Amino acid sequence: MSTNTVNLNFCLNQAKSHYGGFGYLTIVTLLFSSGSIILLQYLFATDQISIWLHVLLSAYLFYMIYSPLHEAVHGNISGKHQSLKWVNPVVGVISAMFLLYSYTEHKWDHLLHHKYTNDPKLDPDYFVKADNPFSVIVRCVLILFKNVPY
């Protein structure tokens, strides 16, 4: 057996010892981020925080709420518990709702992204690739409209 195969098997065995349990912390992340987003909207709507603080905190919280969506797409929340597989789409739909996105569409796109990572023709996220940070930001906004029928 080659050294690379031995190293790969070692890494796989190490990784297996860390997965399979239920993702309680992912549920906590969902509850904290969604509750905080709702509270933040209330505070802003009642003029208790500035728009700048609102934008800053919202950016962080929307970044945070993507994590449960990502874990749900991969089916990681339920772990090895077959009877809890229903938790993945529930968490995914709730997280996606806050991001004004479809869980089903994101699951499709994200798994295609993993299958075809960095393939210019097949990776759905390749559109974001650009030569400078400004172009990346613009493309990140435009990618939201890539599947809108005209």
Outline where the language-model segments fall:
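Structural signature of the GPCR N-terminal helical module
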Residues: 61-73
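Short active-site segment of divalent metal-dependent hydrolases/proteases
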Residues: 73-74, 117
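Post-HEXXH active-site segment of zinc metalloproteases
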Residues: 78-96, 129-130
